[in-house]
């Protein structure tokens, strides 16, 4: 329902979820996707990041399920790498400055937000423009590299679901930001490229926690990944599984 109501561009949007080509998004969920070629990579785009064994296991299990459904799986290299991190950080820090805050109210902000705003003030207009341009160029290269695939399967997170406040470090907001980057190294590149992606909780670890992986689609092709996700759900129904801690 959310994607249905938000389909199409708002004035000025650089990217948007276009209306489906064949019927509705609900129709896509009910439609067999046909035989797809699904690329995958497990290695994090950031070299210093390690993934939890349960995340790797979720990838292995999901790839097996995809093959069992008759699809082809192809290992690919991560289309994003460490070179994007400084550019992403420049953009993220600048975005923290979009909301004007009175100087006397700055101290009321979360330390991480204060830190990002401080970093953003140190970035010149030329540096920000360069970062945005390089991110767009890399996004085009990433989409070109995977254009022969119907979808790409990657982990959603590098670690298991975090406890509330687990990553927060008010005493060292730089460490807080670094922890968040290491926790979620896979999503940022696709958030920047604007490609559609859908999380599927295909695997559950021994503690009863869902471990998600995500299907990333071609630009403006929500339909294929919705069909694939629905097909996986039909054969590995997770709708009624609830973690014990809930």
Where are these regions (language model features)?
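Short, Asp-centered acidic motifs that coordinate Mg2+ and/or phosphate
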Residues: 150-152
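A short helix-breaking turn/cap at a secondary-structure junction
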Residues: 4-57, 80, 235-246
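General small-molecule cofactor/ligand-binding pocket signal
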Residues: 72-77
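Short helix-loop capping/hinge segments that flank enzyme active sites or metal/cofactor-binding pockets
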Residues: 27-42, 91-145, 155-159, 199-209
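Short, surface-exposed loop/helix-turn segments at secondary-structure junctions
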Residues: 16-17, 86, 92, 161-184
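Short, well-ordered beta-strand elements
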Residues: 209-218, 225-226
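Small-aliphatic-rich amphipathic alpha-helix that forms the alpha element of a beta-alpha
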Residues: 143, 175-200
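Active-site pocket-shaping loop/turn-to-helix segments
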Residues: 46-59, 63, 126-132
């Amino acid at each position: 329902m959310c994607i249905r109501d938000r389909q199409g561009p708002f004035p000025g949007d650089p990217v948007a979820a276009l209306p489906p080509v064949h019927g509705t998004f609900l129709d896509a969920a009910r439609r067999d996707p046909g035989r797809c070629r699904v690329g995958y990579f497990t290695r994090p785009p950031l070299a210093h990041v390690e993934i939890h064994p349960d995340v790797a296991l979720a990838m292995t299990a999901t790839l097996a399920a995809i093959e069992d459904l008759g699809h082809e799986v192809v290992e690919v290299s991560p289309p994003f790498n460490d070179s994007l991190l400084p550019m992403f950080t420049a953009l993220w820090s600048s975005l923290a400055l979009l909301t004007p805050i009175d100087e006397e109210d700055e101290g009321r902000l979360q330390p991480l937000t204060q830190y990002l705003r401080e970093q953003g003030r140190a970035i010149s207009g030329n540096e920000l423009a360069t970062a945005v341009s390089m991110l767009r160029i890399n996004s085009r290269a990433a989409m070109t590299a995977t254009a022969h695939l119907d979808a790409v399967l990657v982990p959603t997170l590098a670690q298991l679901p975090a406890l509330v406040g687990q990553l927060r470090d008010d005493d060292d907001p730089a460490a807080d930001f670094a922890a968040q980057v290491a926790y979620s190294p896979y999503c940022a590149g696709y958030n920047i490229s604007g490609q559609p992606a859908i999380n599927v909780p295909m695997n559950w670890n021994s503690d009863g926690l869902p471990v998600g992986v995500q299907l990333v689609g071609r630009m403006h092709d929500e339909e294929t990944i919705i069909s694939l996700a629905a097909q996986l759900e039909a054969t590995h129904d997770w709708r009624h599984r609830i973690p014990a801690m809930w």
